Amino acid sequence: MYEGKHIHFSEVDNKPLCSYSPKLCKQRRLNGYAFCIRHVLEDKTAPFKQCEYVAKYNSQRCTNPIPKSEDRRYCNSHLQVLGFIPKKERKKKNDALEDVKTKHQMETMAFSLTVPPLALKMPNGHDGLNLSPPGARLPIHYLETDLEDPFSFEEEEEELKKGTSVKKKLQSKLAQNWQRLRETEIVNVHQEHFSPHPAHSPLQSPSLQEQHTLVQPISTLPKPTGLPQNLVCKSPQPSNISQPVQGASPVTHTVAQTRHQSSKRPFPVLPPVTELPRNDRIQLAATALPAYSSYVSRLQRLVKLCTRKQQLDTDLFPHFGLDWSEDSGEEQEDSDQSSPYRTAWSFRESFRYDCKKLDIEEAHSRSSRIAQLCTYFQQKYKHLCRLERAESCQKKYRHTFRRALQQAAHRESETTGQLLQELRTTTCIRTRPIQPELRGTEVTLCSATISNGACRNRALPYTRNCFQHILSNSSQQLFSSCTAKFADGQQCSVPVFDITHQTPLCEEHAKKMDNFLRGDNSRKVQHHQQRKPRKKTKPPALTKKTKKKRRRGPRRPQKPIPPAVPQGNLCMPSSLSLPVEVSSIRSPSTPNLSTEELPDDITSEITDIPHDLELNQEDFSDVLPRLPDDLQDFDFFEGKNGDLLPTTEEAEELERALQAVTSLECLSSIAVLTQADNATGQDLSDRGISAFSTGSGGSVIQSLSREDHPDLGDLLNGHIGHNFASLELDENLLGSTTLSNPSATLSGHIQGQFSSPANVGLSSATLISRSGERLGREVMSHHVDAAAPILDKQRVSGALYSGMVKHSAEWV
């Protein structure tokens, strides 16, 4: 279904209204569409077309919709404008009232012509007649409604329709007669004012003898001069009291008498007053009011009809002591309030039954189905008409009853109250029928037999067994045995009244089951609490996604570290070896772990572990929470990638060590040059050895270690192991006695160790170069990442480099 932009709902019943897009429309929607009849053209699928009329003054087309099924081009309003259909004549709303006013004015004018205004005045100056004011008289069609019989409950609606024309004629005649009687009453009252009072008139009706004046002043007034003594001035009766008048027909007198006599409580007529008349008092005489009793009699008739209808609605048979449930009581009230003919037979079911009787081809034919459907709709229409007619009749009955009750309560409140009390008692008796008295139930004992004899317990109501032996009755369905079993496997035989559980339990076993379930829940909670860690290092990031790290593949095998001892005939002298203890190489930040604390069988366990076993991040998930709390000072994680960051002092020492390494690299480059020139001749080597032995070479190394670069001596004199404890230096890298004493020169040691002059040519240079390369490799492999911003080869002093070049030139 297509909808516009303005989708809103009604504030009264919250139903959707027209969704017209250009502006807000508060009209109701058409069935099946989202627009009203005025704006339904916005929906292109609607079966409507636009009016083709175009206005002349603005050249705009009419927007009224026309059904597509109708063969016309213009809407109804423009068909009238164009003259295709006649225009409707609008009737004025005040036409009926104007007719009534003109008719009333004519009546008052005729009355004023027949009766002079002075004749309606009493001698004391009071008006004799209570004339109705202008406009108080109702028209004839209002009088017709009053003259209708409101108690025609048994009349059928069809008969009412047939007799409407006859009834209207009769009512119009009655209204005319009533108006004539009214005029004759006025004329008779005018004649009665000035007529002499007869002593005993045999023609006077008994109703006139009972008639007395309501207000009779006995004041001594001057009587008119032209009248005799026996003339009595009677005050006329009020117009609002419907009493028989003198000039009325004898039929009206008899009706008044019968109504007066049929009253339930006739009003006694007081005897004439015998007291002397007084001038300062006005004597009031109580008279019978038969009009009041007519309202009560009307109400009595309605009450009788209501009770009769209630008796017809009651059941023919008693309830046999069974009370109505709440639902049935509500259904009974609903049925009382609902209109008759509410339950109707199903026409569709009857058609299906007829279809079964017919042949298959005839039943499935289109014409037969259309005929059946038409018949169904006709019957349904008749049924709805009956329902509507019954509903209207019921509303009319209720309105009549309320009107009669109001009038009777206004006139006779006591009698009306008594009637309502009687009606209420009959209603209560109908809604709550008298139940028959239940027979006296005798106390019966259980009929079960036990070992000692018969059971003495009291039997349950409507049974022959007590609670303990109720299971012996095979016909009962309310009780069942307990489904629990004891420790020895015996079934519990206690009866249980439990209709909610599939496995009923007695009271004892139910308590045990509750305690067991409660303890099981507490154990689960306690176990769950024990599994939680005692201390959380960091709160888990709930919003942060955890990325799983990929498993690293097998690492590539690293190149083997070259051995500390040089290959070939060049061996490391024992005098140059520097003793380094392994225990002193550990980082000062790590705790001192002794092997005594380890278990005895740890060596066997270590040998069983395969060497190709890889460790992943998941392997540490169970190990890290078990670490003791006293490892807070343990530098396990430092830096971003877990590397050990050097302190300021270590950085300074490392800088000095790297400067020494650069000097050793210079010496190694010199040794390479000398090795290249070694093939030129033996003279050069002999001269180098002699020069080196005489002290020139020793002076060079001595001056190098003492004067030019004092840090090199400190580096080689054992400060490396002390300042860089984290370096794992090889023990055969440097000797312990070499360069330990600054006064000792390298020449004596070299001459003592190397006796062959052929192998001594490059021994010192090779030693220094190999030791420098080894030391540099160890330092660079451990601290190249941490000391990268500190490295600066330009810090090597130019004097040291120039001195080294000078001495090497002399040595060559």
From Swiss-Prot:
Residues 521-573, 581-600 are annotated as: Disordered. Keywords: DNA damage, DNA recombination, DNA repair, Nucleus, Transcription, Transcription regulation. It is found in: Nucleus. Residues 585-595 have a biased composition (Polar residues). GO terms for cellular component: nucleus. Pfam families: zf-C3Hc3H (PF13891). GO terms for biological process: DNA recombination; DNA repair. Coiled coil: none annotated. Its main location: nucleus. InterPro entries: Potential_DNA-bd. It comes from the Eukaryota. Residues 524-558 have a biased composition (Basic residues). The keyword Transcription applies. Putative regulatory component of the chromatin remodeling INO80 complex which is involved in transcriptional regulation, DNA replication and probably DNA repair. Belongs to the INO80D family. PANTHER family: INO80 COMPLEX SUBUNIT D, PTHR16198. Component of the chromatin-remodeling INO80 complex. This is INO80 complex subunit D. It comes from Xenopus laevis (African clawed frog).
